[in-house]
Amino acid sequence: MVGVGKKFTKESKVREIQKNLHKRAKLKRQYLKTLEQEGYEVPEEQKRQKPSFEQRKGEKKQKVDEKKEHARRRKREQKEEMEAKRQRELDELERAKVRQVERERRNKRIQQKTRSGQPKMGPRINDLLDKIQKDTTYTS
């Protein structure tokens, strides 16, 4: 099993890419050589212009500014989110207090008794009537 290695390792991928690059470079050299031999004009390779120090410095500064702006925006959004969450919690606490007060008032009304200790039916019936009126299944 000579020559059979792992096909999908990082090293094999790197080797394959380098092999392809060398192959392309070799083909390009051969093409340019045949053009020259046949008498055609060989195009000059254009050198890549490296950005100047000032341009690179400006780009770096721009990237840093973008990162800072992104961080500021994210911090502001988090602050707004926290404030909204806090407000929701306060509203929920307020609603819970109102429900508790209403529940206590209702229980006090229902627990009323006559002089002989019997429960009063009027407040209980009124409470049931209120429940029926609030429920949408009974009203159309």
UniProtKB/Swiss-Prot annotation:
InterPro entries xrefs: Fyv7/TAP26 (IPR013730), Fyv7_fungi (IPR017265)
Cellular localisation: Nucleus, Nucleolus
Coiled-coil features, chain-numbered ranges: 59-112
One cellular component term from this protein's GO annotations in UniProt: nucleolus
Protein name: rRNA-processing protein FYV7
UniProt GO BP: maturation of SSU-rRNA from tricistronic rRNA transcript (SSU-rRNA, 5.8S rRNA, LSU-rRNA)
Keyword Lyase applies: no
Organism: Eremothecium gossypii (strain ATCC 10895 / CBS 109.51 / FGSC 9923 / NRRL Y-1056) (Yeast)
Top-level taxon: Eukaryota
UniProt region (Disordered), positions on chain: 36-140
UniProt xrefs under Pfam families: rRNA_processing
The family this protein is said to belong to: Belongs to the FYV7 family.
Biased composition (Basic and acidic residues): 44-69, 77-105
S-S pairs: none
General function of this protein: Involved in the processing of the 20S pre-rRNA.
Keywords, ordered alphabetically: Coiled coil, Nucleus, rRNA processing
Keyword Protease: no
